[in-house]
Amino acid sequence: KSALPFFISESISKFYYNREPNRKKEIIKAAKISGVENKSFMELTGEMYQQVNIYNNQISVFGKNFTSPISKNCLKHYKFYLLDSLFIDNNWCYQIDFIPKRGGELTFDGSLWINDTTYALKKVKGYINKTANINFINELEITQTFNQVEPEIWMLTKDELFVDFEWLEKGLG
């Protein structure tokens, strides 16, 4: 399916994290938003600026809580398949695909890439299940990439969200 982007948001930032005490700081170096300037569209897409944390048990997407594929209860909601092993950015990783155990649950389909030595999450790509029933959304894809910044510390370095919106032909009422 071909897509023409009509709204793109990009930013480059430096992110600082301190484990003890737990503090985070982000300095945005540059930001650019390109595309349509329609108020109702901007309100709808405003939720796209939410922070998606794959390590949380629940991931909030457009007002609905999805079970993370790496949540504490992931084995109750997902089936996992070891699919491949490959190099990603000089890291040997295992590709593990996941699918929902049952239809109708707020879950994802997708893949995890796990570092073979540290078992850290290198990359995740997830798609909403077609039964999620989110208004105006046909398809949603979340991709996150993590890089090792210290021997035991991996950090989110790339965060992508792709949303395929479906507009109603006629107004409501």
Annotated model-derived regions:
Residues 1-95, 99-107, 168-173:
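Structured extracytoplasmic
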Residues 67-69, 81-82, 91-173:
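Gly/Pro-enriched, hydrophobic low-complexity segments
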